[in-house]
Amino acid sequence: MKNVKIALTKGRLEKKAIEIFKTININTRELEDKGRKLIFNCENEEYNIELFLVKAKDVETYVEYGAADIGIVGKDTLMETNKEFYEVLDLNVGKCKFALAALPSFKLDQGYNMKKIATKYPNIAREYFRKKGMDVELIKIEGSVELGPIVGLADAIVDIVETGNTLRENGLVVVEDICEISARMIVNKASMKTKKDEIIKIIENVSEVIRQ
């Protein structure tokens, strides 16, 4: 049984993925009391798995370069970049959406002035407005993008919306939904060949859980 390395996004998706792994009998005991550890042995009679926790944007890199065979990461991260791997499963967890949001006075089609859009996801925002045939100025922000329209930095924002509470608390409204997103499983292309049996087993078992 070949060793399979899984890169898992820290935080919210980590917890959701661990629940799925438990269901298919992957040994997650070390993850339940992890302290400051980053690498975990999840081996048992059914699986030979090594799992490590990384930031969302790094999951793709680990998988693309073969340091990880499998990755669990949000679709938002995949949409923003253009890396080489197989996207094999929608895990149906971590659901939220991309949306255009602004102050209530904002009008998307008002006037000829170029709109300023603040976002952590410039590639996604650029593609959204390209499809609308609109030229906009994109302002990349790493922190709380909701602040942009409030202080006059931007006319609107493109960001992830889960409950909408943060928008409401800051006086913003959703102007338009862009797309639904959720957690995905990705696989290194070479690993799919060299560790095919082990990886297919994981994919099939996780698929069964998702269908239930």
Swiss-Prot record:
Keywords: Amino-acid biosynthesis, ATP-binding, Cytoplasm, Glycosyltransferase, Histidine biosynthesis, Nucleotide-binding, Transferase
Keyword flag Ribonucleoprotein: no
Catalytically driven reaction(s): 1-(5-phospho-beta-D-ribosyl)-ATP + diphosphate = 5-phospho-alpha-D-ribose 1-diphosphate + ATP
CDD domains for the chain: PBP2_HisGs
GO MF assignments: ATP binding; ATP phosphoribosyltransferase activity
Function: Catalyzes the condensation of ATP and 5-phosphoribose 1-diphosphate to form N'-(5'-phosphoribosyl)-ATP (PR-ATP). Has a crucial role in the pathway because the rate of histidine biosynthesis seems to be controlled primarily by regulation of HisG enzymatic activity.
Homology family: Belongs to the ATP phosphoribosyltransferase family. Short subfamily.
Assembly notes: Heteromultimer composed of HisG and HisZ subunits.
Comment, domains: Lacks the C-terminal regulatory region which is replaced by HisZ.
Protein's name according to its UniProt entry: ATP phosphoribosyltransferase
Species in which this protein is naturally found: Clostridium botulinum (strain Okra / Type B1)
Origin organism lineage: Bacteria, Bacillati, Bacillota, Clostridia, Eubacteriales
Underlying gene: hisG
